[in-house]
């Protein structure tokens, strides 16, 4: 099968789109992507359901900045899951079905969340360190919603600048196969891809790896590990209960281990494969399948982050439970009030009132007749029978 990209040669030919049967390894890869996509939608929707009401709720002990970062993680994940649907469609049909603009948008959303998610986790670890270990002024500043939005906007702008090659070198590539010169027909297959010049690709991957992998990993480990040391030092100088201090230390250590393990397992293969592509050409089917599953690992980590932060934070769960209880109580009071108003409205209807009065009058009449009838019966039962009188008594 001959492949060529000479578009001018086949410009006026009849293009026949190549339809690849949905079978083989593409079936397993697409099924895996669809499964993780569904799980990602469910998990992020649940986290949004828990976190979003707390973002503007008063008197919440959890820092608003952390709530905002978790909210931003979920929104970014949902956008990435929507973009993943385009990749699934390409896997099913075997060719890209959309325009070049949609292709660029897909690659931007895909790359943006892969860079933004580690940075947001980096900011969360910094916020936890600031609120626990730094002085009160800086801790309160780091916990504010305004400060979190400013930091997020700076990180977002940095990522957009970093992604300029994706804007410049993303396009839909058309491959021409099996040309028929007699009928002037050619089979075409389209693929959405990011293919910059080799030098730009190398420096882009290197800078992206440092800024969105190495630096966040170092920051997450450093700031989270600093918290238990600070708590331990404070326990030695203050009268803090050992049980509560041990619980806090266990919680921090669990968070650090989970984040680090997920981060290393999901992101290390991804960045290794990005640089390995310059050495090995992916032609074997097994290598292509492995690359698809490696590409899936960052999606898994992005889904895991908001779930970990929500489940391990007791303050978020208790605050959400309180809001849900208040909403149920408010709904119950509204229901009771509506029922009371309906009953009042029914009582004030004139026709209903007259019928009710007539019913009461009729009931009273029946009761009076019944009472009179019972009294007469009792009086008659108290008198002797006429047949029992002697004859001499009759006058």
Curated annotation (Swiss-Prot):
<keyword id="KW-1133">Transmembrane helix</keyword>
<keyword id="KW-0472">Membrane</keyword>
<keyword id="KW-0812">Transmembrane</keyword>
<keyword id="KW-0297">G-protein coupled receptor</keyword>
<keyword id="KW-0807">Transducer</keyword>
<dbReference type="GO" id="GO:0005886">
    <property type="term" value="C:plasma membrane"/>
</dbReference>
<feature type="transmembrane region" description="Helical; Name=4">
    <location>
        <begin position="148"/>
        <end position="168"/>
    </location>
</feature>
<feature type="glycosylation site" description="N-linked (GlcNAc...) asparagine">
    <location>
        <position position="180"/>
    </location>
</feature>
<feature type="transmembrane region" description="Helical; Name=3">
    <location>
        <begin position="89"/>
        <end position="109"/>
    </location>
</feature>
<feature type="transmembrane region" description="Helical; Name=2">
    <location>
        <begin position="66"/>
        <end position="86"/>
    </location>
</feature>
<comment type="function">
    <text>Not known. Putative receptor.</text>
</comment>
<feature type="transmembrane region" description="Helical; Name=1">
    <location>
        <begin position="38"/>
        <end position="58"/>
    </location>
</feature>
<comment type="similarity">
    <text>Belongs to the G-protein coupled receptor 1 family.</text>
</comment>
<dbReference type="GO" id="GO:0007186">
    <property type="term" value="P:G protein-coupled receptor signaling pathway"/>
</dbReference>
<feature type="transmembrane region" description="Helical; Name=5">
    <location>
        <begin position="202"/>
        <end position="222"/>
    </location>
</feature>
<dbReference type="GO" id="GO:0004930">
    <property type="term" value="F:G protein-coupled receptor activity"/>
</dbReference>
<keyword id="KW-0325">Glycoprotein</keyword>
<keyword id="KW-0675">Receptor</keyword>
<keyword id="KW-1003">Cell membrane</keyword>
<dbReference type="Pfam" id="PF00001">
    <property type="entry name" value="7tm_1"/>
</dbReference>
<dbReference type="InterPro" id="IPR017452">
    <property type="entry name" value="GPCR_Rhodpsn_7TM"/>
</dbReference>
<feature type="transmembrane region" description="Helical; Name=7">
    <location>
        <begin position="287"/>
        <end position="307"/>
    </location>
</feature>
<dbReference type="InterPro" id="IPR000276">
    <property type="entry name" value="GPCR_Rhodpsn"/>
</dbReference>
<protein>
    <recommendedName>
        <fullName>Probable G-protein coupled receptor npr-29</fullName>
    </recommendedName>
</protein>
<feature type="transmembrane region" description="Helical; Name=6">
    <location>
        <begin position="252"/>
        <end position="272"/>
    </location>
</feature>
């Amino acid at each position: 099968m001959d492949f060529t990209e000479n578009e001018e040669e086949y410009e006026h030919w009849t293009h026949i789109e190549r339809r690849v049967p949905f079978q083989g390894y593409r079936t397993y890869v697409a099924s895996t992507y669809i499964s993780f996509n569904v799980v990602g939608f469910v998990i992020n929707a649940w986290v949004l359901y828990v976190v979003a009401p707390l973002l503007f709720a008063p008197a919440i002990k959890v820092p608003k900045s952390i709530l905002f970062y978790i909210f931003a993680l979920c929104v970014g994940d949902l956008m990435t899951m929507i973009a993943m649907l385009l990749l699934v469609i390409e896997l099913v049909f075997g060719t890209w079905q959309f325009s070049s603009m949609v292709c660029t948008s897909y690659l931007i959303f895909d790359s943006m969340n892969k860079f933004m998610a580690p940075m947001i986790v980096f900011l969360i670890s910094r916020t936890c360190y600031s609120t626990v270990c730094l002085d009160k002024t800086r801790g309160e500043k780091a916990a504010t919603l305004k400060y979190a939005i400013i930091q997020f906007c700076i990180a977002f702008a940095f990522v957009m600048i970093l992604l300029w090659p994706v804007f410049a070198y993303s396009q839909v590539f058309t491959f021409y196969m099996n040309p028929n010169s007699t009928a002037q027909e050619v089979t075409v297959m389209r693929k959405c891809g990011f293919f910059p010049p080799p030098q730009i690709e190398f420096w882009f991957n290197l800078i992206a790896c440092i800024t969105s992998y190495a630096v966040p990993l170092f920051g997450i480990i450093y700031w989270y590990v600093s918290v238990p040391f600070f708590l331990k030092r404070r326990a030695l100088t203050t009268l803090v209960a050992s049980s509560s201090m041990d619980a806090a230390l266990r919680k921090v250590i669990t968070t650090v281990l989970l984040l680090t393990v997920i981060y290393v397992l999901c992101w290390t293969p991804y960045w290794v494969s990005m640089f390995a592509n310059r050495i090995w050409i992916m032609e074997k089917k097994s290598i292509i399948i492995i690359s698809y599953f490696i590409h899936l690992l960052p999606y898994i980590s992005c889904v895991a982050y908001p779930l970990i932060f929500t489940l391990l934070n007791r303050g978020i769960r208790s605050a959400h439970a309180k809001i849900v209880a208040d909403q149920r109580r408010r709904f119950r009071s509204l229901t009771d009030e509506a029922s009371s108003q309906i009953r009042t409205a029914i009582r004030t209807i004139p026709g209903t009132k007259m019928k009710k009065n007539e019913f009461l009058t009729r009931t009273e009449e029946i009761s009076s007749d019944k009472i009179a009838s019972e009294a007469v019966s009792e009086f008659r039962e108290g008198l002797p029978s006429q047949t029992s009188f002697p004859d001499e008594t009759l006058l």
